[in-house]
């Protein structure tokens, strides 16, 4: 069977339109001519880019915009995410790797993963230190030797981090009847994911590793909606239920066996515009003592605010003052109106 072929210009114009058509470009009838025409259009538009490029370069040459134009590379965001993944595979063997683990190969697996993690982390720490030194105009700190030392110090904290995360998992199992097993908590719970990444980042923060801890916790923030600053101090047995919208500021101190629900903010009071640098190392966020429960959407602010042990803070509470140990803070029951 044959099928009729219709050229792109098969329609014949009427006499009334002939005058108009004479002024138009010749009709394109082949694919190659169409492609050539498109390439011509693209190339013509490219000629308009150089002035924009010059404006961008001029912006970066001023002090009004931010750039990183330097022979020293910044830490790699994808590489740091991979470090998180690999660290979690060490903290929870068998959960986040494709390897089939048993007692005969476990030590080999842990050895290989730990060595690989050490090398990757050393490289990223060295980039972070070099960038920080150049940005702050600091004298040379022997960044290569320092990065190896810091990476090793971090690796040495992993047994304790594993033990602390085990208490967080047990707290989740004890506090949430909806969970069926530790596997479900480890695989599925955004609260534990955010806490795990926080505990990894916190150890690097304590070692004064630049920028990498914050990249880690902000990655967790983007995944879970839970914002925990790596500088916060959080005790064992920590449980965040549901999690979305939780904020925990840099100088927050949280005791052991504390439970938070979604939307809780442990934050700082509003600061004057020029006060940030002066208060950078001052305690700005609350202290939550042992065995406290804070229900959904409550906000607790201020560095002098202390929530005493075993206190319960109800939902939708706004607090800027301390609460004694063992007290319950609840809103007065609102009046419902039916119409």
Each language-model region and where it sits:
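Amphipathic alpha-helical interaction segments
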Residues: 11-14, 326
């Amino acid at each position: 069977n044959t099928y009729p072929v219709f050229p792109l210009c098969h329609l014949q114009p009427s006499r009334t339109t002939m005058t108009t058509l004479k002024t138009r470009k010749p009709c394109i009838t082949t694919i190659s001519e169409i492609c050539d025409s498109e390439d011509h259009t693209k190339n013509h538009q490219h000629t308009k880019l150089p002035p924009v490029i010059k404006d961008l370069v001029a912006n970066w040459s001023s002090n009004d915009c931010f750039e990183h134009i330097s022979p020293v590379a910044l830490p790699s965001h994808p590489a740091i995410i991979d470090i998180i993944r690999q660290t979690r595979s060490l903290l929870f063997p068998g959960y986040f790797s494709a390897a089939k683990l048993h007692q005969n190969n476990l030590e080999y697996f842990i050895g290989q993963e730990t060595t690989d993690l050490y090398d990757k982390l050393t490289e990223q720490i060295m980039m972070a230190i070099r960038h920080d030194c150049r940005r702050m105009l600091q004298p040379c700190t022997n960044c290569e030797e320092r990065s190896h030392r810091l990476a090793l110090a971090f690796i040495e904290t992993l047994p304790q981090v594993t033990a602390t995360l085990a208490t967080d998992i047990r707290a989740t199992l004890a506090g949430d009847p909806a969970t069926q097993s530790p596997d479900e908590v480890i695989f599925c719970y955004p609260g534990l994911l955010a806490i795990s990444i926080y505990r990894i980042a916190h150890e690097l923060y304590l070692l004064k590793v630049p920028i990498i801890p914050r990249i880690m916790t902000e990655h967790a923030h983007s995944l879970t909606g839970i914002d925990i600053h790596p500088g916060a101090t959080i005790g064992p047995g920590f449980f965040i239920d549901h999690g979305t919208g939780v904020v925990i500021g840099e100088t927050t101190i949280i005791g052991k066996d504390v439970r938070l629900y979604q939307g809780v903010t442990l934050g700082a009071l509003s600061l004057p515009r020029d006060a940030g640098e002066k208060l950078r190392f001052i305690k700005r966020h609350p202290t939550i003592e042992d065995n406290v429960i804070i229900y959904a959407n409550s906000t607790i602010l201020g560095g002098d605010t202390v929530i005493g042990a075993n206190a319960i803070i109800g939902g939708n509470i706004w607090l800027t003052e301390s609460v004694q140990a063992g007290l319950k803070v609840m809103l007065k029951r609102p009046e419902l109106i039916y119409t």
